From Swiss-Prot:
With Ku forms a non-homologous end joining (NHEJ) repair enzyme which repairs blunt-end and 5'-overhang DNA double strand breaks (DSB) with about 50% fidelity, and DSB with non-complementary 3' ends. Plays a partial role in NHEJ during 3'-overhang repair. NHEJ repairs DSB with blunt ends and 5' overhangs with a high level of nucleotide insertion/deletion, without a need for microhomology. Acts as a DNA ligase on singly nicked dsDNA, as a DNA-directed DNA polymerase on 5' overhangs, and adds non-templated nucleotides to 3' overhangs (terminal transferase). The preference of the polymerase domain for rNTPs over dNTPs may be advantageous in dormant cells, where the dNTP pool may be limiting. This is Multifunctional non-homologous end joining protein LigD. The keyword Metal-binding applies. It comes from Mycolicibacterium smegmatis (strain ATCC 700084 / mc(2)155). Mn(2+) 2 binds at residues 136, 138, 226. The gene is ligD.
Length: 762
């Protein structure tokens, strides 16, 4: 049987006490057996109680003693339990909401044998509509199980006439329960009215066997078809709940074939568990729209978004690139470090008391904790006293990682499990190396620094990327300042006279730059890998993106190097930027390699300098930063004079006047979580040659379907020819409007060095 997502929750925060206490004397059933039953049945039970206020009926001393109902959640209840409040005439009652296996474990620990819920769920903290109808078939004195089943089939027939499905249960007490899922939720009052009419209709059709009246004196020899439990204020024993009877019976889902069996009887908890492998959840369609637990369910249950600055997203996490990590210094009750690795839309998290080991000679404890949201990659702040994890948290390091092995058992904290293993190579500013996390037992893992594998091959290097920001507050003591050159980013691998040039995406582009052949001779005594920019210069010697787009043979194109990644068999990725810069300048001294001068002064002076020189902007680099291939790092900050944005072409409009035979404007978008977002049109900045070239390139990409995630505004949709979103360009613009459009965009050119999936808002 496939496991339901609810079954993946952990329960290490619930400690079972008095496991040997006998709760069912007639069978000797202990509290430990009850606890194990609820843990085992949670995968199918939780969807039918999720989102609903839970009333518990407790037998702390067993079913031979008195029981009591408990609605109000005690102040001592754990903070991670989800809550919901209902205001009654007598006041407000706060109920537990059991959305997880762990929550059901808490119910069992309290000896709450019976779980009762209404037929509605909370919605945004308030009482929502009924999602299902329930009929309780309560037998009067002398009524047999066969007669109950006869009435159940009659109810089913009436529901079928209404195009509604009906699901039967033996209640575990005396009667039967029938559940009817509602395709469209209705008010509890509406559900009660419908159920009452069905009951009254059967009472009229079968007056000797059915009554819809609550008066007990009228029930002898009849089945009371109880419709009243659909009232918003009433509850019903939950499917799969134990019953507080002499024997540990269960409100057990049954098949309709069983309801026709004259030998039908109530089932014990062990029998219900045995049936799971054969039948699965017979009620699965009943609550198919239940709020599905995801990997952040436990995380959310431990935090109140109104009380903590931590991110508490409501959305189900979406899978990302599985390549980011963060280490946070957490000044909680005890100082420790939290390692978080992006995986399948969440951050798999470990508390590491002494941080990751620095050498291969030592191992350190790492305690697995609940998955955290992706937003936690950037979280820092103070968690208030009284909240989970209270204390100050700062980002100690962050970066990217590569995976060799990532095995985290589904039952992460099973005390008998020791099969988890993670091997990753971390690329951060402080941590850079190969690490293993090995599960020793349950939630305890071991963190080990491994020997690094052979250095990455030069042909595998990807460019390090800068983060958008302002350099105004940066000082020259900590930061170096370079010009941001208006060209194409390239990686050059010069190996003793052999030259290879790759674009930012790794595409081989050696043939596109015949002007760089001389570098092979200039660097013939070395094997060197350089990072830099291919630039086309205008008449005044300033890099021009327009010239780069439309370069002719006579266009002056140069390679401007600004970093060195490899030299004669040695990787320089871990060297400080200051040391790499010295090596680069020494390599260029007296040769043909161009290394542009750094900019003078602090951040403001550097920006003023590039304004006067008409450069694109400034890139600030920390003197002590390492080179982090393929990662957008906060160690490099780019600050542009002009607003520029990479865009994806999603269509074009016919021109007018002199452009009537070609393109008048391009229709632009930026990829996002929901698809390609329309950001406007651009109709200026083109040369006639560019427009002709664009038309030829877009013609084979024609499509009848819009590539955008929403219909275009009417004024923009008129006369549009849609194309497949495969070409990337760049525009300059004045500002971004509140609805996500680019104001006054001007075309700068195509970006053949970029792919659509690389385009994001800058």
């Amino acid at each position: 049987m496939a496991r339901h997502p609810w079954g993946m929750e952990r329960y290490e925060r619930v400690r079972l006490t008095n496991p040997d206490k006998v709760l069912y004397p007639a069978t000797g059933t202990t509290k430990a057996e009850v606890f194990d039953y609820y843990l085992s049945i949670a995968q199918v039970m939780v969807p039918h109680i999720a989102g609903r206020p839970v009333t518990r009926k407790r037998w702390p001393n067993g079913v031979a003693e008195e029981a009591f109902f408990e609605k109000q959640l005690a102040s001592s209840a754990p903070s991670w339990l989800e809550r919901g409040s209902i205001t009654h005439k007598s006041g407000t009652t706060t109920y537990p909401i059991i959305n997880t296996r762990e929550g059901l474990a808490w119910v069992a620990q309290q000896a709450s044998l019976e779980v009762h819920v209404p037929q509605w769920r909370f919605e945004d903290g308030d009482q929502g509509p009924a999602t299902r109808i329930v009929f309780d078939l309560d037998p009067g004195e002398g009524v047999t199980m066969t007669q109950l089943c006869e009435i159940a089939h009659e109810v089913r027939a009436l529901m079928t006439d209404l195009d509604l499905e009906t699901y039967p249960l033996t209640s575990g007490s005396k009667g039967l329960h029938l559940y009817v899922p509602l395709a469209e939720p209705i008010s509890s009052r509406g559900a009660s009215v419908l159920a009452r009419r069905v009951a009254q209709q059967l009472e009229q059709a079968m007056p000797k066997l059915v009554t819809a009246t609550m008066t007990k004196s009228l029930r002898a020899g009849k089945v009371f078809l109880d419709w009243s439990q659909n009232n918003a204020a009433k509850t019903t024993i939950a499917p799969y709940s134990l019953r507080g009877r002499d024997h540990p019976t269960v409100a057990a889902p049954r098949t309709w074939d069983e309801i026709a069996d004259p030998e039908l009887r109530h089932l014990r908890f062990d029998e219900v568990l045995d049936r799971l492998d054969e039948y699965g959840d017979l009620l699965a369609p009943l609550d198919a729209d239940a709020p599905i637990a995801d990997k952040l369910t436990t995380y959310r249950s431990m935090r109140d978004a109104s009380k903590t600055p931590e991110p508490v997203p409501k959305e189900i996490p979406k899978t990302g690139n599985n390549d980011k990590f963060v280490i946070q210094e957490h000044h909680a009750r005890r100082l420790h470090y939290d390692l978080r690795l992006e995986r399948d839309g969440v951050l798999v998290s470990f508390a590491v008391p002494k941080n990751l080991p620095e050498t291969t000679a030592e191992n350190r404890l790492a305690v697995h904790t609940e998955d955290h949201p992706i937003e936690y990659l950037a979280f820092h702040g103070s968690i208030p006293k009284g909240e989970y994890g209270a204390g100050d948290m700062v980002i100690w390091d962050s970066g990217s990682y590569e995976t060799e092995k990532f095995r985290v058992p589904e039952e992460l904290d099973n005390p008998d499990d020791s099969h988890g293993e993670i091997i990753v190579t971390l690329h951060g500013e402080k941590v850079d190396g190969r690490y293993a996390l090995i599960q020793t037992k349950g939630k305890n893992w071991l963190a080990h620094r491994m020997k690094d594998q052979k250095n990455a091959r030069p042909e595998d290097f990807a460019p390090m990327l800068a983060t958008e920001g302002s350099v105004a507050k940066y000082k020259a003591k900590q930061w170096a300042f370079e010009g941001k050159w208006d060209g194409y980013r390239v990686i050059i691998d010069a190996d003793h006279g052999q030259l290879q040039i790759r674009s930012r995406t790794g595409r081989e582009v050696t043939g596109e730059y015949p002007q760089f052949k001389a570098l092979a001779a200039d660097l013939a005594e070395h094997h060197v890998v350089l990072d830099g920019e291919a630039v086309a210069l205008d008449e005044s010697g300033v890099p021009s993106f327009g010239q780069m787009q439309n370069r002719a043979r006579s266009t002056r194109v140069e390679f401007w190097a600004f970093d060195i990644l490899w030299l004669d068999g040695r990787s320089l990725l871990r060297a400080k930027y200051s040391d790499r810069r010295k090596i680069l300048e020494a390599l260029a001294d007296g040769g043909g390699l161009i290394v542009p001068d750094q900019l003078p002064g602090d951040g403001p002076e550097a920006m003023e300098h590039v304004r006067k020189k008409r450069f694109e902007g400034v890139v600030a680099k920390k003197w002590d930063s390492t080179y982090q291939p393929g990662r957008r790092s906060s160690s490099w900050i780019k600050d542009k004079i002009w607003n520029t944005q990479e865009v994806v072409i999603g269509g074009w409009r016919q021109g007018e006047g002199g452009r009537s035979s070609g393109i008048g404007a391009l229709v632009l978008g930026i990829p996002g979580p929901e698809g390609l977002q329309f950001v406007g049109r651009v109709g200026t900045g083109f040369t006639e040659k560019e427009l002709s070239k664009l038309k030829d390139m877009l013609k084979p990409l024609h499509t009848d379907e819009s590539p955008f995630n929403a219909p275009l505004p009417k004024v923009d949709a008129r006369g549009v020819t849609f194309v497949r979103p495969e070409l990337v360009g760049e525009v300059r613009y004045s500002e971004r409007t509140s609805d996500g459009r680019l104001r006054q965009p001007s075309w700068r050119g195509l970006r053949p060095d970029k792919t659509p999936d690389e385009v994001v808002w800058e």
